[in-house]
Amino acid sequence: KVQLLFICLMLSAAAFAADKVVKLPKPNLNRTGTVMKALSERQSTREYASKALTLADLSDLLWAANGINRSDAGKRTAPSALNKQDVDVYVILPEGSYLYDAKNHQLNLIAEGDYRGAVAGGQAFVKTAPVSLVLISDVSRFGDAQKTQNQLMGAMDAGIVSQNISVFCSAAKLATVPRASMDAAQLKKVLKLKDSQIPMLNH
């Protein structure tokens, strides 16, 4: 089986159980593989092995998703409309939910407890995935959060981050599937989101 990504990152529980901040190792910018090969092998997968993902792989995955690749300007691997960097990546683990802090390349604890069921929505196979990534767009970074155009830009930006995740997972031989199904209301409560922060997609 392909190593779980669902992102099936089972990073040993010990790595997260007691830490409110998890420092990630520096991303490996010299990983093997080509973009063309990754695109040719990209696929959505809903069956996962339970083998743990290393902290190094999680680090590379999050950096590829929406990390900072130009530190002098603070710009990201994923472009965003007007460079507003509206998409935040939340890491949902059995032990708790974390926000990926791209600037410091670390995970910050948001809520303790298992909220994988909120990510699953109506799809039960997600509930047992060791980890999911939830993509949240804060459309207020564009101005009026109620403006349709701003919400569309947020959805577009989340889609770009999602594609980065899919391509990285293909190259790294990790299984994943992009999803829009989730219990958005519960996630907004658990993750302490503002009204302007919209759950767009998850993996």
Description of each model-found segment:
Residues 18-129:
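N-terminal amphipathic, basic helical "cap/leader" segment at the start of enzyme domains
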Residues 81, 176-179, 195:
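Short, surface-exposed helix-loop/turn micro-motifs enriched in polar/charged residues
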Residues 20-21, 149-151, 200:
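A short, structure-level motif marking secondary-structure boundaries and short turns
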Residues 5-13:
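Bacterial N-terminal signal peptides
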Residues 42, 61, 89, 131-142, ...:
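Small-aliphatic-rich amphipathic alpha-helix that forms the alpha element of a beta-alpha
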Residues 192-203:
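A glycine-rich helix N-cap at a beta->alpha junction
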